[in-house]
């Protein structure tokens, strides 16, 4: 009997101990909780330090702003604070165009930005100033060029006058000093006369311009006016000469692609004229229409759709307008050429020469536009 009682009381005591362990409250936290508490306390302390630094920085900025405001008020000029200059964006005034029923067209680019200008480089001649009427966006560029030419002429005259004074012997210095003003006036008149192109030079320049205009982009004879010692005449010669490099390159490309049996041809329609070359699924060379047709329909383009010329859209009207504008400018130049060539020598000679230079630059711009429209 005693053995049975002992065996029955053992499981009851084990269950009571297990319940006591479960119900006993945990006095000490585990190691994970301790580490978490340490991390939280560390991050809170770091955040508080950063907040203190930010507060200190804001106080310094406010002090600087107040000092700037006080100094600007005392001097009578309002200057923006550095915080406002950093935060406030710049307001750009935009002009709102009136709403109209007309269709807005994209502005046509006259010349590509990467294309090189056919005119020569005058950087060595004009103290680093590049004179290019095709790429000149500033409308006052011509006036700047003319002012630089005038300054260089005055400097040359001054140097010549100093050299003439140094070359004179000492015994004749008194007579030279007495006659200096008259000699200076005479030398200035002679230099102005030498700078102004004569009637024969103007006629030669007119012949070169007429030959260039009649050719319309073809190769012309390189006839230039006689050489002169003045820099203005050199600029006129450089501007008046046709852009032979661009014309020769375009003619060379045309002759290469015209009758060359080894030229690139489309493997589908056998054409050699296209705006861009592409590759089909097999890697063969195809023209732009055949490549786009295959990409869209996944089928080869029928040969019946072949056109041995590049389609031109809205080109004829623009070409006629540009050619008419070029003829008007050329006629105006022809009418104004005799008056500018035979103008006043003593007072208005330099002004007439500069007007001639400006007219020549306008004519070259018009002809470049006409040549660019003809290549489309």
Swiss-Prot record:
Probable transcription factor. Involved in embryonic development and in vulval development in larvae, acting redundantly, at least in part, with elt-6. Perhaps acting together with elt-6, may form a positive feedback loop to initiate and maintain lin-39 gene expression to ensure proper vulval precursor cell (VPC) fate specification. Together with elt-6, acts as a downstream target of the Wnt/beta-catenin asymmetry pathway, required to adopt or maintain the seam cell fate. Residues 1-33, 65-122, 148-197, 240-264 are annotated as: Disordered. PROSITE patterns: GATA_ZN_FINGER_2. This is Putative transcription factor egl-18. Residues 241-250 have a biased composition (Polar residues). Keywords: Metal-binding, Nucleus, Transcription, Transcription regulation, Zinc, Zinc-finger. Expressed in differentiated seam cells. Expressed in the head and trunk. Its main location: nucleus. GO terms for cellular component: nucleus. Residues 68-89, 165-175 have a biased composition (Low complexity). It is found in: Nucleus. One of its GO terms (biological process) is negative regulation of transcription by RNA polymerase II. PANTHER family: TRANSCRIPTION FACTOR EGL-18-RELATED (PTHR10071:SF155), TRANSCRIPTION FACTOR GATA FAMILY MEMBER (PTHR10071). One of its GO terms (molecular function) is zinc ion binding. The gene is egl-18.
